[in-house]
Amino acid sequence: ILYYPILVVVLTAAGLYFTCRTGLVQFRMFWESIRLVMEKPQNEGAVSPFHALMVSTASRVGTGNILGVSTAICLGGPGSVFWMWVIAVIGGASAFIESTLAQVYKRRDSKGDSYGGPAYYIESAMHNRTLGVLFAFFLIITYAGGFNMLASYNLQSTFAAYSWYDPAVTPWIIGAILGALVGYCIMGGGRRILRVTGVLVPIMGLIYVAAAVIVVVMHINLIPQVFGMIFADAFDFRSILGGVSGSCLMFGVKRGLFSNEAGVGSAPNAAASADVSHPVKQGLVQMLSVFIDTLLICTATAMMCLASGTPITKEIAGAGYVQNAVTVAFGSFGPILITVCMVLFAFSTLIGNFFYVDNCLIFIHKKEPGKSFMTGFRILASLVIFVGAGMSMAAAWDIADILMAFMCLINIPACLVLGGTAVKVMKDYERQKREGRDPVFHAADVGLDLDEVEYWK
């Protein structure tokens, strides 16, 4: 019930509403979003649009892009891929709205850096700290708990293809190593997270997409058949309506939402950290992250798996299906390639998630928590990663899905209430562009209460 009909209806309706309200912003301003990615920050040493994008992409582009897609195909059918595309396309507008709002209502810390997110715009614009704290709480347990346990499980599951894998021992060894490595990175705080993700994300994306392209080129004659499978299964309404919970629609929505996180309220925490002259700039950049995630990385996985001709069965859902697919093209090197990609994807996801968690801990405490508290929390979070490696696939996915749904059901209504502000800010940006200027934001120009927009006073 939580996912269907509630979340499916909320996500789809909100995405379509924002798409119409912004005048198809994800299509009209797509090239503008690409141009803005490499824009330099306003102040030297501040967080650039690119680095903020890499943090959100590090979290978005994770194990779900490989194993989430393969699981959706094996359990929901090839049509799941189409519904992932739909969620991404309409979700681009939702991502733009939430990230623009995060920029508008962001705050400034003692070092001059900016921070913010849904919890902050809920408190500042809706004057509801209780709801903001509730959102922050769900984000913390979702990202430090559910998502990190899932990433840890997904990573260790790729090692099951090797003869030395012992299901009673190996998951715990991998979990311990992963927890220790992530613990080291996150002990350095936000700046270290930004540096690590800025290096890892482009590398892992290029390696994985290159491998997928090779597989697709080797089976280029099957691509028309692959698209035929996707569309035929996507519109098999008798199958969908006959068993919604296990249909391609349901798995497409679940894995699409998990993969691109549009509307969930996570990426705005990274968006708020970017030092830009106008909130819309980062809103557009974060919108691009949704397309990188689903329309590029997830599609690469789907094409690679379906074009390989590997039989689709429920028994190989997850790592097995992807590894079998790449083995067709790369032989015994295939599983090794997927393992390397999974290590990079899982690691970047884990450390990117902690950027969001830190932001919400600051919100709940009303200031940056003490060093001893943060050290203790990060040690506990590293232990959660260790525990996640030993979980079952069903438990890992179910926990992540349920927690993410609660975040979405708080953030989307907040965006609907505040969406008019984001649209006003967008029109201000477009007006300045038409005048031939590099847009600079002044809160008073769009009629905002200056007491609510601390950073832009």
Indicate residue ranges for each PLM-predicted region.
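N-terminal alpha-helical transmembrane segments of multi-pass membrane transport
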Residues: 1-63, 73-80, 91, 416-457
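Transmembrane helix-loop junctions in multi-pass membrane proteins
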Residues: 21-26, 65-69, 78, 145-156, ...
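Helix-loop-helix module between adjacent transmembrane segments
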Residues: 14-19, 87-112, 118-153, 157-185, ...
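Alpha-helical membrane segments and immediately flanking helix-loop junctions
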Residues: 43-75, 101-119, 123-125, 140, ...
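Membrane-interface loop-to-helix entry segments
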Residues: 10-17, 21-34, 154-159, 170-218, ...
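Extracellular/periplasmic helix-exit of transmembrane alpha-helices
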Residues: 19, 97-106, 211-229, 237, ...
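Extracellular loop-to-transmembrane helix junctions
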Residues: 2-32, 74-112, 292-300, 402-412
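Selective recognition of specific alpha-helical transmembrane segments in multi-pass small-molecule
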Residues: 90-98, 176-190, 201-221, 254-257, ...
